[in-house]
Regions:
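Bacterial N-terminal signal peptides that target proteins for export
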Residues: 1-12, 21-22
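Helix-centric, low-specificity signal for extended rod-like, repetitive segments
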Residues: 1-3, 15-16, 244-245
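Sec-dependent signal peptide hydrophobic core
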Residues: 11-16, 168
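Intrinsic disorder/low-complexity segments, especially N-terminal tails and targeting/processing regions
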Residues: 18-19, 27
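Phosphate/dinucleotide-binding and metal-coordinating scaffold of catalytic cores
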Residues: 24-273
Length: 273
């Protein structure tokens, strides 16, 4: 199964994304900061400009921040919606949650798994009386929906696939009910980022699409095996409920078991890289 030729998710937004959209910024002169430096900038830099983000249905804002030395844009998402029932295009969802807190939890989990280079840094911050998640505005060229529409092929299919395998494992772990092709951004040298987790961490204890689990990075599998509930609880702070944490660990168990079974059947070299 080659992820280069398969849809990233069954849910694909109908809107056509233009390459000149405000979401896409040029990578030239992009500052090189550590994760901790990025967090501190997002937490402390002054907001000097704002405008509604050009995409999405969760009322996000594109903010311009400066600390006096560095000026950079950030994404601010304050949504925190809880409903007993929500009617969506895909059907009715009970105990519906759409919350910026899941962005923070997803980044914390990505850090634990060693794949935080594939997820933008998210911090919790208040702006204009609203608390939300603030993330580094990424230097992307296009999203995965645009790549599919334009039928663009990555120059290094193996490197691309290895990134996509990680994203697929992460998605099965976090149970994002709104994952779609616009949530995968593509930057310089076909670098991939996964963004927007506000509808993740559903309570199902089984991976939604186990067939997406085709191959796995060796280090990622070891990190998955080592993940423990106490550390996850501590890292995600107050962002996840006890039931959401239990569901993550249950899905982790299923994912690890599936890869172990695949290794037993096919051999390690066919499954891990």
């Amino acid at each position: 199964m080659n992820p280069l030729h398969l849809p990233y998710r069954k849910l694909i937004l109908a809107a056509v994304v233009c390459l000149t959209s405000q979401r896409f910024v040029v990578a030239a002169d992009e500052p090189t900061l550590t994760g901790e430096q990025t967090k501190q900038f997002l937490l402390a830099a002054k907001v000097i400009g704002s405008r509604p983000a050009s995409k999405g249905v969760t009322h996000t804002w594109r903010l311009t921040l400066t600390d006096g030395t560095l000026t950079h844009d950030a994404d601010f998402q304050p949504i925190d919606e809880h409903k007993s029932e929500m009617k969506l295009a895909s059907g009715t969802e009970l105990n519906f949650v759409d919350s910026y807190k899941y962005n923070l939890a997803a980044y914390a989990l990505a850090e634990l798994l060693g794949i935080d280079d594939m997820v933008p840094v998210y911090v919790e911050r208040k702006w204009k009386g609203q608390t939300g998640s603030m993330s580094w505005w990424l230097p992307s060229k296009m999203d995965e929906a645009t790549r599919h529409k334009q039928k663009l092929t990555p120059p290094d299919p193996d490197a691309w696939n290895n990134q996509m395998y990680k994203i697929r494992v992460f998605d099965q772990l976090i149970a994002d009910s709104d994952a779609n092709l616009t949530n995968v951004l593509i930057g310089e040298n076909w670098k991939i980022w996964r963004i927007d987790f506000s509808r993740a961490f559903r309570l199902n204890k089984e991976p939604k699409d186990p067939k997406d689990l085709v191959r796995c990075d060796r280090q990622l599998l070891e990190k998955l095996k080592a993940l423990d509930a106490n550390t996850l609880t501590e890292k995600t702070n107050h962002y996840l409920t006890k039931e959401e944490l239990k569901a993550v660990m249950a899905r982790r168990d299923k994912i690890v078991a599936q890869f172990q079974n695949m290794i037993a059947e096919k051999g390690e070299n066919e499954v891990l890289y």
